[in-house]
């Protein structure tokens, strides 16, 4: 689904690390690691999949509103997921603003994306136009 880091607490990170590396003393290492890590990975998956599914649905609604059809939708869906991953990884603030500005410039120059639609996608993901100034 989505690549990139997702925010995890120290206890989640330690739990996964502990489950992985205590298993190396067992001869069936791969099986043991997967068995021990599965509940933690499933929890992370269940936490983050709804976020990115919601992003896809929201971006799709914006694209329908602007009349974007066919393969062009993939450009804006990809942009939306990149913005959502950046928000998930680094949170709101100046770093996110810089990241979004760079992504927008890249998508405009590389893919010929419409800046107005990119702004609409950004605003729907960040929750408010006040969170991003184009």
UniProtKB/Swiss-Prot annotation:
GO terms for molecular function: DNA binding. It is found in: Virion. InterPro entries: Sulfobus_virus_coat_C (IPR022014). Its main location: virion. The keyword DNA-binding applies. GO terms for cellular component: helical viral capsid. It comes from the Viruses. The keyword Transmembrane does not apply. Keywords: DNA-binding, Virion. Coiled coil: none annotated. The N-terminus projects into a DNA groove. Self-assembles to form a helical, filamentous nucleocapsid. The capsid proteins wrap around the DNA and maintain it in an A-form by non-specific desolvation and specific coordination of the DNA phosphate groups by positively charged residues. This certainly protects the viral DNA under conditions such as the extreme desiccation of its host. Homodimer. This is Major capsid protein.
């Amino acid at each position: 689904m989505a690549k990139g880091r997702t925010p995890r607490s120290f206890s989640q990170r330690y739990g996964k690390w502990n489950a992985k590396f205590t298993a190396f003393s067992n001869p069936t290492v791969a099986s043991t690691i997967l068995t021990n890590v599965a509940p933690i990975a499933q929890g992370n998956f269940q936490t983050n999949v709804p976020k990115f599914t919601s992003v896809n649905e929201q971006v799709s609604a914006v694209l329908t509103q602007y009349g974007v059809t066919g393969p062009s939708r993939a450009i804006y869906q990809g942009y939306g997921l990149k913005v959502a991953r950046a928000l998930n990884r680094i949170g709101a603030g100046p770093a996110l603003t810089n990241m979004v500005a760079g992504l927008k410039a890249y998508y405009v120059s590389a893919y010929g994306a419409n800046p107005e639609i990119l702004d609409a996608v950004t605003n729907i993901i960040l929750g408010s136009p006040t969170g991003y100034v184009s």
